[in-house]
Amino acid sequence: MFFNSLLTNFAALEVGQHLYWQIGNIRLHGQVFLTSWILLGALLVFISFGTKKMENDPKGLQNLLEFLWDYIRDLARTQIGEKVYRDWMPFIGTLFLFVFVSNWGGALIPWRLIKLPSGELGAPTADINTTIALALLVSLSYFYAGLSNKGWRYFEYYVHPTPIMLPFKILEDFTKPLSLSFRLFGNILADELVVGVLVFLVPLILPIPVMFLGLFTSAIQALIFATLAAYYIGEAVEEHH
């Protein structure tokens, strides 16, 4: 009884105000959906323009997109392995681009100029619900990768190299999504808060270098998230001897 009450109170905790959409019994964070759709739409437009007229000698947007493609391919090949990396390139690439665009969108776009009935817009990755959803998606993906490539032999991983490792391997399955989600959430939220406070206190000069540092941090966090996702998938499909 006490435990259920504690969980209920913990789930009710909020930081700031939020815009909610009520769909039946489901309560959604409206501002997260709005910013996600806007950023995904901008990303799709960017990609469609870059691939509209493909040339043998790439330049402009096509050159940038081919660079990203090569980078994601090399990342997936290095972390997952030569055998199955092609199957996971779209997933790793989508993760990287969504996190990257979400992080940079929060740093570059003045969302607070858009007034809402309640709450305010910001980077989707500055919301813990988004980062937890992404981390759980990664967890489901590496479970699927292991089972689809090895079948029931995948569970041998939990007792390799010795059965003593079983509780630690199970605990690891819980800590992986926690570390993924809280690392991304904490870094992006902290960056938004620091820039917001500096803009309020010293609105002219000081926030600019901090914003550039935030852009660098945002790109690094997207790279870390995609790299760890690929590493976990590679770990799941790796053959243990």
Curated annotation (Swiss-Prot):
InterPro entries: ATP_syn_F0_a_bact/chloroplast, ATP_synth_F0_asu, ATP_synth_F0_asu_AS, F0_ATP_A_sf. Gene3D superfamilies: ATP synthase, F0 complex, subunit A. Keywords: ATP synthesis, CF(0), Hydrogen ion transport, Ion transport, Membrane, Thylakoid, Transmembrane, Transmembrane helix, Transport. The chain crosses the membrane at residues 30-50, 91-111, 128-148, 193-213, 214-234. GO terms for molecular function: proton-transporting ATP synthase activity, rotational mechanism. GO terms for cellular component: plasma membrane-derived thylakoid membrane; proton-transporting ATP synthase complex. Its main location: membrane. It comes from the Bacteria. It is a multi-pass membrane protein. Pfam families: ATP-synt_A. CDD domains: ATP-synt_Fo_a_6. It is found in: Cellular thylakoid membrane. F-type ATPases have 2 components, CF(1) - the catalytic core - and CF(0) - the membrane proton channel. CF(1) has five subunits: alpha(3), beta(3), gamma(1), delta(1), epsilon(1). CF(0) has four main subunits: a, b, b' and c. Belongs to the ATPase A chain family. NCBIfam families: ATP_synt_6_or_A. Key component of the proton channel; it plays a direct role in the translocation of protons across the membrane. This is ATP synthase subunit a. It comes from Prochlorococcus marinus (strain AS9601).
